[in-house]
């Protein structure tokens, strides 16, 4: 049914219906004459798109009513009455009841926590049943007159401004208030609902409402005396205490309601009872205490971090924002200006609409208010709200990127918490995704484009593209990564509770239902609901948008010929969706004619000028082509590739034709050509278009050659030109990857399917032209003064040039790997001479001695690059420098290897007269001559990597990969998290350091025991902690370096030379080192680099039959697949965060001894002998790392691992069996680690006031008691009292262990009756004071001691002198005889009476009681006999006092005293 526009024609008196729609405000020009004075607007805005009530018109009366009857049926009087009713319809509409959505009473962040960790939406949406008070609101009586119609708005405003009066029929305190403060006059009319600003509603028509109305009518008929009498009768029947509680609560609620301001707490009952008649509930929050710290310290449980974060997010609910995205401070707008009555979500639109004077939006808007305003019936208000949301999200992202990585917000920090704002906006309460999806269907173009802008901010389109643009320039792997938010799966007991588990998608791919119609082909009923869509959006906003069918809407917008701005924005959104996950990429590819529409829109512009949407179109196709090889081949086959890359061939003659386009057009054309060349690169990597090199190379010659920079500098086009040139060289690098073997015989050029070496020589000449001009362009001799705006793009260009040259040189190899080269291509020494001549390297010792010390001048290009890396504040400039260093280093290493290989072919040294110094350097070895400078660069990056890995590790603070769901840069983490340029810079530095480690392999064979070698080992360990999902090769190289036999031999030397070791014996042959190296490398590679097999549902199989439950359960922790690391989507150039483990946790090296008892990490159950061998090698490796950690000059990552993890690993390895400590070498190593960690524990205990240093339950796992049961069960079954095994078990009785774990350990040991198997106190780890001090004060632990005493679990322990017996005697003696605290009297008396009563029943424990009576810590035998007698007498008095006069117990004490005096035990 169409609605009227609201315009009334005065010449048509019969057009009465149209005049009744005045409350629907729309744009338009009224046909009436403008009044002399503007009429006030009507505040009848409705929530959009909630259905309007029929009273808002058109007014078609039901059949049978007087309005619907024919004209001749009504007489004049009835017609007049009907007309009068129509005239008063506006006032009637004020009390109409529109359709209501389900109300959310308050924000519950616990629901969010359940949502992000669970998979069933039904479990998160169960309403909490609570007792609700019945509310009756007074309203003015309805008067059916013309005056009432004209004054309806004023009446509604007056009703809103008036205080609401509440009546509760079944609660006496409220009836009392009714008769005193808020008594209703006898002539008052029945209560009606009050307008809420966005809609009105009647009182409920339920039975409770009817009873309410009846009670209220009864009250009207009663006199004041009768009301007072009824009140007194009710008060007499109620409990006074209950009455007092209810009265205080009512007064507190009234006081808070009157004086509430932003941030003031309010009880849940008040929040539920205030404005419950509105469409939205006014958000009220509890007062949030400031957290002390959000940094995850070893002693802070994960639950505390989550609670602190939840409080921060809740605080963001009441923040108000201006239209520029800034937070409106509380003191900017006074309460009198904003008005307390305009503080709720339901009144934001009416506030702005009514307050035409001044600035209606000066008070700002909360996020929920802005979302509510986005559903207004006025398009202008919808646009305004969406622009505000875009500003807030954009501001939040920019602020997050400006903050530090791993930044911990402290209590004193009063700045705006943008992390919490971003998380709240994307959270489940505002339902932003649902509002945006509905706004995208708006019929106003301005609203749609404003909505798309918000989605762009929501998906961080611009920031993510900047990140991927840098990623394109980096090498050498060149892989993209999907942006879907992820979280770590929970640690498992079978894997030793180690962190660093597999990443999982926040929203399961199976829940991203892109096309509902495909699932409904079998005729089943669609059970998907908006609730499920919102649930998925709460886990991942991009997944929620796809599930809400955003792709069909985007396709429809593209088909309707949108504006250039809208087209560019929606394609940008599509790129973000394609980058999200494989499921989203597949959804775009499978959508009918989606790609064809993109290509068609690209081809509509036949002119030479470039549109921004064309750039995004090519970028989208490139992202889709990266997904898999078949997609790329299809694009080439169906002509899509050719249709979008023709611009590359338009500038082939000279540079002038391009420069004449102008600055803006040149910028757009260069950006388009860059994307087209990247599309070429993707196709080449997929094996397509390689044979088309002769066609492409002439078009690239303009950009490959060095141009006239005076013309470019004059037009300010250096950055635009060099960006195209850089990408052109990267395309040549991709072509170089496909070069055939140079020395293979008879390879036909046209039949090989690839380009050949005949094109390499002109390509090298073009590259050398850039090297020749490098000193003039970069001017590195001036140092820091040479840095300009174009320096970054020039360095990216030189990085591409060096990468291309190094790739060509690496492809030159003989047919056999060990065979020498038959001959050397002439361009190899040509490249070397160019590098030497133009001072890309320094060969002077004097220059190297001042390396990096003088910022005003640099002696070489390498020094200049290293200087920029250390001193530059621009991360992209530093990244370009590191990549340029990487390419240069690879080039000189390849030149050195090729020349040496060619020389080895010569039978006798070839005597050639060397004419120049440059040729002399090349003959002596370019790498050897520049080794001093390379060493300086290596040391610089070694220090850098050692300082960067803690920053990368600090990002994983919360349970999920980021602080909020969605594709936001870094998933909402501070500084961008894993997606920041700072992390990219650290990973690039680690990659360069890996190259330097490979260079130094040949030199490290003779530096056994040196500090330099240990620095390299520590830097390799740090590299493992920095590497991301794209850096598998980097981690494998680090494993190879640390685990090679020579490195293991060096670790053995460090163990033997460790001064902390008391006695140690080690026997191992060279073959043993090779065997351990192989086993450890295989284990670590399989444990940390093996990807997880994906289930069928995650592969995106279409046609899944939907049942009654839409969000089905998928078993996340299935068995590993048989595929290797590279088998997972090997043809894809985009990798996933999910299904892999990197970045590795700091304690990754403990996995060899922490997870050996489980077969989950392999394809089948491993053999027990293999497990044992891995465990033995793991114990040796751990001992070596611990011993060598103090030898290097750099801090070792091993030292940073908390001691609790190391003790836990030593306990875990014992689950393999006794074989692990029956082997002589392994037993010595295990004993050595115990002694070492015991010393570390004593040092930490003396240096820290906090006694609980070993928090096994808090730091390892909350169910650690289960693990303890396994350890004790193994100890009781196979140990036979082994001292080494017993020492490890006794660690859990140390006073540095948290009391809950001590209690669990003691209980398990006591129940298993193995307390007597524990060693004596002098044989335990560490000093004895660690077990005895501080004195035990936990009552649960003391009661466990007492229970073990009385049940006989300590009888044998007393005979054998077990540490368990010593602990009990010491703590009982300290509590009973030394602790005189009054709060311990009852516990002391309980222990005394229980011990004496037990003695009366079991006389054989008299010796144990005498030990308790005579015990004195550490010096019992040194005491004189008189002192002993006096002390015994004093202690007997304490025991008698504890018996509290019990004659039976006192008699037993007399017997004990006699035995003590006689010296009898």
UniProtKB/Swiss-Prot annotation:
Name of the protein in its database record: Transcriptional elongation regulator MINIYO
Record lineage: Eukaryota, Viridiplantae, Streptophyta, Embryophyta, Tracheophyta
Disruption phenotype: No visible phenotype when heterozygous. Embryo lethal when homozygous.
Tissue specificity remark: Expressed in root and shoot apices and in leaf and flower primordia. Detected in the endosperm, embryo, meristems and in organ primordia, but not in mature cells. Found exclusively in the vascular bundles in mature leaves.
Main location: cytoplasm
GO process annotations (BP): cell differentiation
Protein's organism: Arabidopsis thaliana
Keyword Cytoplasm: yes
Keyword Acetylation: no
Annotated signal sequence range: none
